[in-house]
């Protein structure tokens, strides 16, 4: 069968009704990146596919087709811990929306796929007291790196110099951390101590946590190019006093 793919590890990142009884499903896959498939009959009441094609559920999928839009042939549901805690669900919807809206079609990134699975596993283990922000920041970082926007927290790209405690720095999404504090930069006044803490892996302490949130917000918005993320509103609606998580 031409264009056939079998037993491909995949997750549903978005789905919607298509024509009379089908679903149009966006998948994030290990070896093919983001792919769109038509699941024929999946939107009918008698089809088991509708219950199986759920977000956060690991799948093995078969599809066929030579065009960009493939046809789902078969799928196998794999076991995994459920993502059920409300903030974990909202966070999962957020990373799914990032993948669905920004990742190019048919551009595989095994490293990002591994980060995606790791993030879902951590979200499944999240308790009501756990902090979700470090998980989101790490995924955002891996997501940006997969698109060519990686950077070092502790080195300036405009001078190649190491970040110093006690100094202030800027951030440009097209470059990374910079020593230049030009007015046109989207972020300035980033404390060197916080950047060094982030380079050491500290996403929990107050100053690096806030700095990472500011930087990754600017970077994600840059990658979105004006496209909205509906999942962001879930955080503010669930806890208006806490501010935006993502």
From Swiss-Prot:
GO cellular component, as recorded: bacterial nucleoid
Record keyword DNA repair present: yes
Q: Which UniProt keywords apply?
A: DNA damage, DNA recombination, DNA repair
Which domain of life does the protein's organism represent? Bacteria
Q: Which GO terms describe its biological process?
A: DNA recombination; double-strand break repair
Recorded hits in Pfam families, A to Z, give:
RecO_C (PF02565), RecO_N (PF11967)
Q: Does the keyword DNA damage apply?
A: yes
Protein family according to the UniProt entry: Belongs to the RecO family.
The UniProt function text for this chain reads:
Involved in DNA repair and RecF pathway recombination.
Q: What is this protein called?
A: DNA repair protein RecO
Origin species, per record, is Marinobacter nauticus (strain ATCC 700491 / DSM 11845 / VT8) (Marinobacter aquaeolei)
